[in-house]
Amino acid sequence: RARPRF
């Protein structure tokens, strides 16, 4: 979603 992957 924001920083990681989602």
Swiss-Prot record:
Q: Which GO terms describe its cellular component?
A: extracellular region
Q: Which domain of life is it from?
A: Eukaryota
Give the main localization category: secreted
Tell me which tissues or organs this protein is expressed in. Limited to neuronal cell bodies, neuronal processes and sinus gland.
Sites bearing Phenylalanine amide, chain numbering = F6
Q: Which UniProt keywords apply?
A: Amidation, Neuropeptide, Secreted
Places the protein is found = Secreted
Biological process, per Gene Ontology:
neuropeptide signaling pathway
Entry's family note:
Belongs to the NPY family.
Function summary: May act as a neurotransmitter, neuromodulator or neurohormone.
What is the protein named? Peptide tyrosine phenylalanine 1
Source organism of this protein record: Penaeus monodon (Giant tiger prawn)
Q: What is the lineage of its organism?
A: Eukaryota, Metazoa, Ecdysozoa, Arthropoda, Crustacea
